[in-house]
């Protein structure tokens, strides 16, 4: 039976939500965030799901292309997109709302919040709660003085190890070779993570989707740019 689609509901247009490519993660933005993971009100974000835990987190989810793909690929898993830019996060929230209205019963398992994951990740997730963490096309922060702002660094990796369950995975994708090498070096040096061989990484069901389902990935494809992917297991 064909899926019923409500064509009267229109998807938001990105041109009305444009914002600069990156945001300063150290700036004193104003965010509402739970003091403890137990105080996270997931029912507001997933009103038709019931009492289930978020297990996938897309950090810096951008315009939500990969987040939507996650929802389609794993309909029984809850995924959250975390985005620091206000207009971009507004777009993703409006996009998910429209998708839910257009496709009754679908996309109930994805949501987006505006937050600074570099500061507040442990406020949202319990120890070993997550199965997968995604870092797709993060800000490269090219200047050496700003490398400490990169989303992959030794301090934050310990937080990622805390919220990821043993056997969980970190996924990274970038079109910047130097950043790819930086991320791989720091994750491999952390005692809680081990990189999957490229042959195993290519067999992951998400491998092709990681490269092309996000808006940034599609932009890199249009520009004929290189893409570098790596997957790491939580030991």
UniProtKB/Swiss-Prot annotation:
Residues spanning the signal sequence: none
EC code: 2.1.1.33
GO MF entry, a single one: tRNA (guanine(46)-N7)-methyltransferase activity
Q: What's one GO BP annotation on this UniProt entry? A: RNA (guanine-N7)-methylation
Pathway(s) of this molecule: tRNA modification; N(7)-methylguanine-tRNA biosynthesis
What are the entry keywords? Methyltransferase, Nucleus, RNA-binding, S-adenosyl-L-methionine, Transferase, tRNA processing, tRNA-binding
Where in the sequence is the active site?
139
- Catalysed reaction per UniProt? guanosine(46) in tRNA + S-adenosyl-L-methionine = N(7)-methylguanosine(46) in tRNA + S-adenosyl-L-homocysteine
Q: Does the keyword Electron transport apply?
A: no
Question: Any idea where this protein resides?
Answer: Nucleus
> Cross-referenced InterPro entries, in alphabetical order?
SAM-dependent_MTases_sf, Trm8_euk, tRNA_(Gua-N-7)_MeTrfase_Trmb
In terms of superkingdom, the source organism counts as: Eukaryota
Location (main, coarse): nucleus
Q: Oxidoreductase as a keyword?
A: no
Tell me which CDD domains the record gives.
AdoMet_MTases
Q: Which family does it belong to?
A: Belongs to the class I-like SAM-binding methyltransferase superfamily. TrmB family.
Q: What is this protein called?
A: tRNA (guanine-N(7)-)-methyltransferase
